[in-house]
Structure formats: C-alpha cells, structure tokens
Amino acid sequence: MQKLTRILKAQSMKMISIPFKKYIAAATISVGLFSCSDMLDVEPTLELDKDRYYQNQLDADVAVMGVYGEMMKLAEQYVVLNEVRADLMEPTMMADADLVDLSNHSVVASDNNKYADPKPFYRVILNCNDVLEGLERMRDENRITEDQYNQRLSDVAAVRTWVYLQLGIHFGEVPYVTKSIESIDDVNNPSLFPKLSLMELIDELVEYMESMPYLDAYPSNIGLVGSSAGYDLSTYFVNKRGLLGDLYLWQGNYIKAAEMFRTIMESSTSMGPGAGAVYYDRMRLSWSSSNYFNVRYGKENDINSLFNDNINGWRSIFGRPAGERYSYDVWVWVMHYDSDFAPEYPFIRLFANEGEGEYQLKPSQSILDKWNSQTQWNNVEFDARGILSTKNWGTMEPEVGKFTFNYNAMSTPLQKEGKWILERAASVHLKFAEAANMDNLDGISQLSRALINEGIREAFTPDDFSGDDVTDIQNTLEYGAPYDFDARQGDFPTYRGPWYRHQGIRGRAYLPPITLPEDITGVQEEKYWTEDLIIQESALELAFEGHRWPQLLRIAMRRDPSVLADRVYDKLSKSKNAEAVGRAAGVRSKLMSGDWFLPFHWEE
C-alpha cells in the first residue's frame, strides 16, 4: 500500500489514521471555510492512502488547503530571515542566540540555527509535489475536469515556486526537487538532485510558471473560495501574476515584471467606471471620500489627534478585521491565523512585550532614524508611519506593531490571532516602480518617482498649467503599455481617468514629494538616485513585512554590493548591543565580497 506522505503530514508511514475534521480545520483555519456541506459529512476518523484519497473534487480541495496549511508554518522563518538579516529589525536582549547570529551574519553550519534550516521549506515543496502528482492522476482518471485540474495545478505550482524563490534568496544554491520522493532526506543527495544557483533556479522557476495554464484567481463559485468564521479566502491564495512579476524582476526582464504588477494594479479596470469607488480605488492607492488608509489627523496641527487605531487611517491596513470590505483595496495576499486552529500565530511571541509575548525582536535604530528624518505637510517632524507600524514609539523598548495590533494582553492574553500580509497594494506599486525605473524609455524614471511621491496627476501636471484642457497632460499614455497611466481630471467636458485619484506612496502618508536634485542630469545617475528613493520609501512603508532582504540583495547583485552592505552596517553600528557594533565593519566587508548566503546545512 502506498503512503499518503506529506499531504496529511505523514512523511514516512505506509498507512496513517487521521481525525478528518481536525485536519481540515488545522489546514484551513476552520474549514467550515468550504461552502460544501458534504466536506464535513465524513466519519470522524478515516484511514487513507494515496489510491483511496484522490477520489473527487472535495479531495482535491482538501489537498490544496493542506499545502497552504503547511506553508503557513513558514511565516516565522520568512519574516525573520527577510528582516533580521537586513537593516530594519534587530534582536532585543531577550533574543535567543539564533536570532543574534542571523542579525550579526555569523551563522555557521555547525550551530544548527533553527531559522537557517531548509527542511521546513522542503516539507512544503514535497507536499506540493505529492499533491501535483495526485491532481494529475485525478485528471487522467476523469475524477476532476480539465478546468478544475488547471486551476489547482497552477495554484500548487505557484506555492512551490514561491517557496523555492525564498530558498534561493537565502541559501544561494539549493537542490531542485520536482517529484514525489520517499524520504525527505533524499533532498540532500546530490546524485539525485544537484544544486542550482540562485539565478539558475530563477530561470527554471520562470519557465515553469510561464507554462502554467491558469494565472487568474480561483473562480468565486467553487468550494475553495468563500468565507467561514469571519475569514474570507479570496486573498488567501498566492497571486500568480505577482509571483511571476517577482521572478521577472529578479531575472532582469523588467517589462514583463511591470506587466505582471500592472495587472494587479488594474484589478478593478474590467468593472468600468460604473462600479464607482471600487473602480477608482482598488489597488490604485487612491484618495477616497473617507481616505480610509491615509495618514490622517483629526485636527491638522494636533499631533495627538493622529488616527491610530485598527479601523481608521494607515494603521488599519494591518488592524482591520478579516472580510472588511475596504481591505480589498489594499490586500493582495493575506493569511489569517486563529487561536483555535493550527498552526499557531508566531508573531505575538516574537514581537509583543506583554502577555504571551517574549519581545525577542524590535525595530532597529536605522528604521527609527529614517522615520524621524521625515517632515509631514503639517510640519510635524517625523513620518507618522513610524508610530503606526510600532508600539511604544519613543520609548526605550519600541515594538514591531504591524503583527500585533489585534492582540490584547489584558483581556484575552491567550487569544493569539493575527494575519500574515505577504503582498499588498503598496508593495506592488513599489516593485512596479523598481521595474519601470530599469526600462530604457526616455524619462521613465519620472513615472517611478510619481508612484513614490504624490501620484501621476500631480507629477505630470506642468507647474505653469492654468487652463481646463488636460488632454495632453496628467497622463503617461505616450509610454505605451505597461507604463500608460491616465490620471486626467477635466471638467470642460467632465472627464475622470481611471488613475485620477492616485496619490502615491508618500501622498497617502501625508508627506511632501522628494524631488530630483537639479544637479543630477545624466540618465544613469537619475536611475540610481530614483532607485535609492525606492529603497528608502520601501523601508518607510514596508518595514518588518518581509520584503527588505530580497530587495536589497536583488539590487546589490545587479548594481553594487554596497547597496546591501552599507545598510546592514548602519544597523549594526547603531545597535545598543556592543557585540553588534563590534561586528559591523567585518559584516560590511563580508557583504561587500558577495558572501550573502546562509550555509545549506541538512541535519539528518
């Protein structure tokens, strides 16, 4: 009898017995999530093997959700590796040695650092491989239709691709395993699976994802998509075009990267202007009648009137409850964690300084300095996103707040629920700006800066404009796709382009634009300056979310190692930890030499 393997978290057993309801709940955060009532109409305990498991669409859906249940266990490693190794997050005095070594870039194979362990990533990959084989068999045996197969194939393939990208970013060279295997330790057998370098891996991943038959979201009328217990699943699954955009960005195929990101930015375009606010606001970083996600003050010059709660203003990007309608304007890929179901939400333990928190990681002085260096439109001298991304701002023990705004240590200390936001509108806009800036079109960097600053309409309206005819301004249509934005707002006759509400990253943050210095006249010099602006704004906007190390590494690899090395040096040299300060210069030299990757240590 064949084994069921990773699909149901059994890696070496020939036959397993599982509590079916409990498994579904653990894998899907309470999969009453599925609208199919027959999903729960199953005997409480059921013995399964591969041949008996893949019988119908319900089985296929449970297998897909099992993949995501396993992937959710990677949240802690993902955030820690992508932030602690970079410049915006550092260990506290409460941190364990593994976190300190990551931050100090002193990880060695013999230490068995739990965060530098590739095995959890490969558990997800091998789960994907098993499910992909099972789905193919179901298709061949006519147990699911071709459309059902294509949708689930492409989704699981995208999860596997995303995991491989993370492995490549952190370990540099990794085994590329694309088939089901008996033992997870076979992964580390070079005669079976030779290692690919990061760029070789990316080429493989691009080719694989380009072969996928279905890049759209799941149709809304199938069992996988719905909601239960307050958790909406429409943003739960990986955005395949966003993933392809990331791969193209790494590969240096900037036009294709921009095309993929632009598709997300145009999520509501097919609805047409008749859809009203949804058409103008979804994924466009737009102002609206209530400025739901803007940095806002109740009183213009009263610093204490800053909107700082879970349902108003910029902080609500992270604090809004699941399924709240305006969240669809900004959330691209989000996973929700519930205290009643596995896996456990790890970020209360890592970041909170109360209740069940262990306060192991905190904002670095580097990011605090960056926020404090900004001046808002009302002349308040800090970036409000600093307060709105943290807790205990201005104290000796600031906390990373983006993951813990829904945690209440006083009333419900054991209720550790939260969300893992892997992609949102702002991160897509910033990556689009990075891709556009690398294109060779004349003046294209101005578009990138418009996305960063106050929006397209402001950037492409001449300073001396005073008329009513906006036909030839407030747009970038001359660039052609994927850089053709129409932000025109005219009244004679009335006209509203789909991007007329666009306000830019800094515009939404209530910050004035940062303009290109007059002494920068060369094209390449302008591109580097604009790229540095993108890097800085990414820090201010996306701090702690898991984007930092990939961005710095990507740009360092194509431009100059100092992009990464100088920023990590800045973090370490400003630390209150003497060991970190003492290591700063050595770490800079290490990163300048191209020594960027963790040891691929496999503990058997």
Describe each model-derived feature in a short phrase.
Residues 36-83, 572-604:
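Membrane-proximal, proline-rich intrinsically disordered regions
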Residues 61-62, 69, 97-171, 192-203, ...:
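Conserved, well-structured interaction surfaces
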Residues 362-425, 468-470:
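Flexible, polar/acidic helix-loop-strand segments at domain edges
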